[in-house]
Amino acid sequence: MAEVELKRAGAIAYRESVSEGEPSGPPVLLAHGFPESSRMWTTVMAALAADGRRSLAPDLFCLGDSSDPGPATFERNLEALTAFHRELGLGRVALVVHDWGGFIGLAWASENPDLVEALVISDTGFFSDGKWHGMAEMMRSEQGEAVIGSLDRDGFGGLLHLDGAGFTEDDVDAYWRPFEHGRGRQATLEFFRSMDFSKLAPYEGKLGELGVPTLLLWGAEDKFAPLGGAYRFKQEIPGAQLLAIEGAGHFVFAQEPERCAAAVASFLGGHG
């Protein structure tokens, strides 16, 4: 397996994997979701490196190893992704997104259509009439502080396994760290409360206008971002391909890491 290195660009920590020799295509930029970090992409990044691709995965604010005293809102994470791409001089990229990373990454893609070579969209939403799931609604409510404040490591592990198994104990420890020692708890409230689906209205129709190859990779049993959302993306994006992983839930990259990595590498190898 190719080595995936943890690096830093200012306040943003990120993982990078580079193959030996000349890259075989544009860089791959990966945006993770809640409550994970760039760690979720390590198997995918190794598969991409084996195919000769450079890949980079930043940590969202206050998740993983990124640290910032400011609020971890949708807007600030979008600004951070934009700055990260610019400062590293990535140019055109293939973009891979999951969960929260979908809101942030797809907004970035919509605002920067000339910089997008291909898309892989996984278990997320990007529609202005979307609805939050029950856990998110609780975080957005006045109960949020009490709920997130009472969370311990065991409860956090239970949260990760609400939608199927797949995480190792090392995974749980790694993803729990910002909640135990950092601003992970407050960042959770800040992002959920800042992310009103109505904010996506300016992006309506933009993904379909990109005209780039798109793979929709979904856990067929996802309870947080159900498979129906994938079919809606398929209607909105001409030519989009759908791969639904049977038996997998929301955290499909943890539950089927090798299969997902192979699917992403194969798709981008042929299209981006």
Task: Report the location of each language-model feature.
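Alpha/beta-hydrolase fold catalytic core
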Residues: M1-V28, A50-R53, L90-G91, L243, ...
